[in-house]
Amino acid sequence: MKIRLFRDSDAGALAAIFFSSVRQIGGQHYTAEQVAAWAPGLPDADVFTRRARDGRTLLVAIGENGQPIAYGDLAADGHIDHIYCSPEAAGCGVARQLYEELERVARSAGITVLFVEASEPAKRFFQKQGFELIERNEFKLNGVEIHNYQMRKALS
């Protein structure tokens, strides 16, 4: 596996990773209605191109076949909005390696605190990376009640 910066040609694959991850992995922790609100359809690939150009660092994990298998992003303020792994690559350490690279980027940029709003399946992952749970957030997404967890990690 190799981790590199996003390329425009990755956008379609990242959209598919997001959608399949939410539908399959998220579906193990949320109701069908919640999952459908979170990922009502395959996102437009342009969403990922825009994310890569809005000032955040967008990293992509490339599998043995040369195709993206996971991705994660880091904003200049320390916010990690996305870390998504294809269901086929889940549980193999890909997300951990991707997170470690995002943390390395954060440290080199002088970021002192990382924060996330972690989904139910991501909560345990972030706790293993040293994040502390701040609070559970209850909110509506596309009109459906859902929750996530506000978490943070001080970098020292």
Where are these regions (language model features)?
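Extreme N-terminal starter segment of soluble prokaryotic enzymes
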Residues: 1-3
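Charged catalytic carboxylate motif
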Residues: 13
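Exposed loop/turn and edge beta-strand positions of beta-sandwich/beta-sheet ligand-binding modules
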Residues: 55, 79, 112, 145-147
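Conserved G/P- and acidic residue-centered "switch" motifs that form tight phosphate/ATP-binding loops
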Residues: 93
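Conserved catalytic-core motifs of GNAT/GCN5-like acyltransferases
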Residues: 115-117, 132-150
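Conserved active-site tyrosine of GNAT-family acetyltransferases
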Residues: 126-127, 131
